Amino acid sequence: MAAGELEGGKPLSGLLNALAQDTFHGYPGITEELLRSQLYPEVPPEEFRPFLAKMRGILKSIASADMDFNQLEAFLTAQTKKQGGITSDQAAVISKFWKSHKTKIRESLMNQSRWNSGLRGLSWRVDGKSQSRHSAQIHTPVAIIELELGKYGQESEFLCLEFDEVKVNQILKTLSEVEESISTLISQPN
């Protein structure tokens, strides 16, 4: 295979985007054959396979180390000097790709590494109670809190909580105690 066949910036940029979608964002259906036929149709499969593995390995190395731009430049320079490494044009495309996709890839990796549900959203409001078994409780303020919980790649679950004034005051007291404990721990000398 001629070196120029794997040099083009647009096909390499497309390949890196597809690898990121497959590896970090969980989009199925991105196959080696699809990538080769769409991006490098002139390259035989037996020559494309090692190139694909090399690019996937480089991308995984960069992402797993969460490289900043100085680390990235040093890493890519080392890759260009390595026997069977990458060309300086390929390094430039990889660098440009990482600069524009680092945040999304990092966020995706963080989401995938969480085992438990996380808080995706919170909304609250204060209403006046309009119905009650006891007429004295009608028109008293009620805090309604809605929590949106979920894991990466799954639909959210919603939890709706209702608190009267007494419960809100208890929660505020508990939060003040937690804040006090944290402040005490932080202000202690090592």
Swiss-Prot record:
> Residue ranges of the COMM domain?
118-186
Instruction: Recite the UniProt keywords alphabetically.
Output: Acetylation, Copper, Cytoplasm, Cytoplasmic vesicle, Endosome, Lipid-binding, Membrane, Metal-binding, Nucleus, Protein transport, Transcription, Transcription regulation, Transport, Ubl conjugation, Ubl conjugation pathway
Keyword Acetylation applies:
yes
Q: In which tissues is it expressed?
A: Ubiquitous. Highest expression in the liver, with lower expression in brain, lung, placenta, pancreas, small intestine, heart, skeletal muscle, kidney and placenta. Down-regulated in cancer tissues.
Q: Which domain of life is it from?
A: Eukaryota
Full protein name: COMM domain-containing protein 1
Task: Name the segments for region: Sufficient for interaction with SLC12A2.
Answer: 2-123
Q: Where is this region: Required for binding to PtdIns(4,5)P2?
A: 125-190
InterPro entries, sorted: COMM, COMMD1_N, Murr1
